[in-house]
Amino acid sequence: MRLARLGSFHQSRLSFMRQLLRRLATENWRFETTAFDIDARGVGHAVYTAQGPERSYSLVAFAHDLPPEDRSDRVIATAWDATFALFDGVPDDADIDRLRANVPVQEEGRVSEKELTLSRANRSVRLWDHVVSRLAAGEQPDPSLVDEVGYLMRTTAVYGSGKFGAADREAIADRPECHAPFQVEMLTVYLIRTFVMDLVEHMARMQAPDRAVALTPEMRRRFGIGNSTGLGMAPFLVTHPALINAWIGAREEALSRVRSISHPTPDRVQLFRTCAARARQHAYGWHSEHPIQIEKLANLRNDMDLLNTHLETADLSADHAWNALYLWAEDRLSVEGQEMLVSLLLEPHGHLVDDLSSCMAADETRVWQINGQMTTGALREILRDVYGWALALDWTQDNTQARVWYVSENKLEPRLGERFEEPLEPYEQPLCPGRDAARLFADLNADLTTDEPVGAFLLRHPEHRHMTRRAQIAALLPYAEIRDNTIDAVMMPIDMLRTKLSFFGASEFDPRSDRWVRITMFQHAPFPHELEDAFADDWALPPLNMAAE
């Protein structure tokens, strides 16, 4: 649970995008474009409906003619190339009119309990113009340029769970298709991808009706949906300890199951070898200009070279060969490569690990109540066990408590400031469990008692209620707590972002600073009409022949 390792996670079979597409394929969901009213300027609306066994969901998309000077990925932006809402059911004309008045202005508008998500996206202008012009000329886009960027639009927000009037998660959590985390958000992005590809082909036809061509299926799948994610996502790992425990616990259990296999079967060994080769190709096709990510990518490429060379001679039919391979990686690969290997080990074993998807939701209210009857001695032992790393730090040093998490007034978004450069302490959010654990431990030691009820202690020290709760949760849930200082001078918020995004299923992590990152989602994934094909769950790594296409 150290940030350096969490910030090296990759997508896996348990990622939420993978879960979504498996369900859509297995349950034979049907998709229909029920409206596509877009003019030659690319302005209008479209509706894409997904019909499941019991319910329908509809993406309502609004396309805009955005002046270049107004295009911004920042949270303070007020206009976008496209805006979206995921509607619970099938919207009628009155719903479309209501959404048309509210969705394009995003936070300035208001949606209703009929909506499950609210989103917006901007074009990657260089690639967008290239694709439109090539299709209008009757040609396919340049594959190298497509692979360099990876998407035609990137979302700058996908809001759910009650934001801006949308339905709370509790309203849909009991639906089978919504039980796993972030399923409506992932469905939103999946349908946005389809809309974007339809829109770019539409714009090419408007430019050259008699000459324009559509993207080939293989070229179409090369496009994902981009995303720009900043600090707003980072506190999630601290504020949802039970949920994070469920995610990490499922991943660790999946790895344990694979490592426990006594003798791998030849078909799964061959699939693993293929996945390893694809992962090597993926590493060499992944680019970033951020110094830290450049170093991590160099390590990953070297790791994938080492792994594939090792596999040329490794006996994967031997006793507990997967465990031996894991131990080999611990000694020879960087953390980045080790975590890629974890994802690769899960890949051939869907029959063994996919059921763990059902364990990745959490009722966080179940562990929220403070146990006031616990003794202060027991609480002290929990702090020693879980937060020993924090108790060993010198919290009087400026570097140890250099940062302050706070919420900006204008957008109500989390921000990270410098404690000794800005007057931010009055606005500090409780997002540093390590420091707060050390403060709690110091006050417990000052009382010199071990058998006093925690409730009595908290009557004298109410400022420790939140940390007492966290400690009691962490005592029950082994992966609930990051074991690192979240306000240290050299802490990298992008590690927190990548952790969550890897569970989404994101790829191509490309930090633009230590505080925000661009990613790609659903790249190489089948489109709705392709979900019945054999590769419906074999898309997260690019196909080996892709570079030659």
Give residue spans per PLM region.
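Amphipathic alpha-helical segments
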Residues: 8-33
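C-terminal structured domain segments
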Residues: 448-522
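Long, solvent-exposed non-transmembrane regions
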Residues: 1-8, 41-43, 63-64, 299, ...
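Intrinsically disordered, low-complexity regulatory segments enriched in Ser/Thr/Pro
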Residues: 52-113, 189-229, 233-238, 246, ...
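Intrinsically disordered, low-complexity regulatory regions enriched in serine/threonine/proline
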Residues: 77-294, 298-301, 306-308, 527-547
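Solvent-exposed adhesion/ligand-recognition segments of exported proteins
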Residues: 275-277, 281, 335, 346-347, ...
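Long C-terminal interaction/binding lobes of large macromolecular proteins
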Residues: 308-313, 317, 331, 337, ...
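Amphipathic, interaction-prone secondary-structure segments
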Residues: 24-78, 376-381, 388, 392, ...
